Curated annotation (Swiss-Prot):
Belongs to the MRE11/RAD32 family. This is DNA double-strand break repair protein Mre11. The active site is at H94. It comes from Thermotoga maritima (strain ATCC 43589 / DSM 3109 / JCM 10099 / NBRC 100826 / MSB8). Keywords: DNA recombination, DNA replication, Endonuclease, Exonuclease, Hydrolase, Metal-binding, Nuclease. It comes from the Bacteria.
């Protein structure tokens, strides 16, 4: 017997098909890594026998001129997903301006896919006949923002959200909100998306929906439990600001009268790692070569002082994709923002110098503490001599 009170969903987002990373230093086409991740997502959808697949934007990386290869891959994976369950696609800020025409073409050859290009609700039928009302909030058209001042644009967005709340009440079986924007408080997690942000207060997400599927933020985030609101994150680590991000898709189970349940699907992306050094000396060169030799992903080197020794490391090491010189202040800022991620690198940045700076900023009697620290360092140096 078909259970219309149950809905199994696979939610994925931010594929960025066609992306090439580190174009200014060592361009790396990420196609094969993305395809492996997408293969895993499709396999999980098949294995879990999902009823509906939600794609919340930025499927393509180039907004103006996606490659033929990227469009071919997009069509291929959409077709594979449609064989598993009906698919609903919401556009994002990166998505190609011609996506609407592309969507018209795809929907002309299959009724198992829906492209929601506006703020108007859409009713779809899931795999087992469940009636699902989709409440879409696509990334707003830039022309709309330009026609309005900031206050008017904010009112425009909030009025759309209020209307979607009213529309959610008209659901038959399930109501799902789909949005591509930044939830207030998460702007720092936008990764490569940083810039002009559409920021929405989470309280404005219609509370009567059964699930809120979001896209745009590249790391997994459970925003709230009522309604369950999730960013699944992108499938791969596109740049080094995403080193510690959890990547993948989300499997969601909805049952009428019960709280929703979900499970992360890890896409197993290649790792990224930043190595920090005070200066590139012979010891640092050995450390870089040794680390890169055994590291399965891509590496960035950041150093503070120019020592005059900087051979063609990128020509020598295939997975070293970026070498940057940064000021002490820039490096300290990174360490403050992600202390757990980079704590093992502190010794390469002259730990005691950083600690002295910390004392100056945080301790009123820092002069006395600095004197004690210097005395300890002198004793250590004498014992090592």
């Amino acid at each position: 017997m078909i259970n219309l009170k149950e809905l199994k969903i696979l939610h994925t987002s931010d594929w960025h098909l066609g992306v090439t990373s580190w174009t200014s230093s060592r361009p790396v086409d990420r196609r094969e890594e993305l395809k492996k991740a997408l293969d895993k997502v499709v396999e999980e959808a098949e294995k879990r026998e999902v009823d509906l697949i939600l794609l919340t934007g930025d499927l393509l990386h180039s907004r103006n001129n996606p490659s033929v290869v990227a469009l071919h891959d997009l069509l291929d994976y959409l077709k594979r997903m449609m064989r598993t369950a009906p698919v609903v696609v919401l556009p994002g800020n990166h998505d190609w301006k011609g996506l609407k025409l592309f969507g018209n073409f795809v929907t002309s050859i299959s009724s198992d896919i829906t492209f929601v290009m506006s703020f108007e609700p859409v009713d779809v039928e899931a795999k087992r006949g469940q009636k699902v009302r989709i409440l879409p909030f696509p990334y707003p058209d830039e022309s709309e923002a330009l026609r309005k001042n900031e206050g008017d644009f904010r009112f425009f967005l909030e009025s759309r959200l209020n209307k979607l709340y009213e529309e959610a009440l008209k659901k038959e079986d399930f109501a799902i909100f789909m949005g591509h924007f930044t939830v207030e408080g998460l702007a720092g997690y936008a990764g490569i998306e940083q810039g002009r942000e559409i920021i929405i207060n989470r309280a404005l997400i219609p509370s009567v929906v059964d699930y809120a599927a979001l896209g745009h933020i590249h790391s997994f985030r459970e925003i709230q439990k009522q309604p369950l609101t999730i960013y699944p994150g992108s499938l791969i680590r596109i740049d080094f600001g995403e080193e510690a991000d959890e990547k993948g898709a989300v499997f969601v189970e909805l049952k009428r009268g019960e709280p929703p349940r979900y499970e992360r699907i890890d896409a197993s992306p290649l790792p990224l790692k930043t190595l920090y050094y005070k200066k590139i000396d012979t010891s640092a060169l050995k450390s870089i070569r040794d680390f890169c030799r055994n590291f399965p992903g891509y590496v960035r080197v950041v150093y503070e002082e120019d020592s005059g020794i900087l051979p063609d490391l990128m020509g020598e090491i295939d997975n070293l994709v970026k070498i940057e010189r940064k000021s002490r202040r820039e490096i300290e800022e990174v360490l403050r923002e992600s202390p757990e991620e980079f704590k093992e690198e502190l010794d390469k940045l002259d730990y005691f110098e950083l600690f002295k700076e910390y004392l100056k900023k945080r301790e009123e009697n820092h002069e006395k503490l600095l004197k004690i620290l210097d005395e300890l360092l002198d004793e250590v140096k004498k014992s090592e001599a």
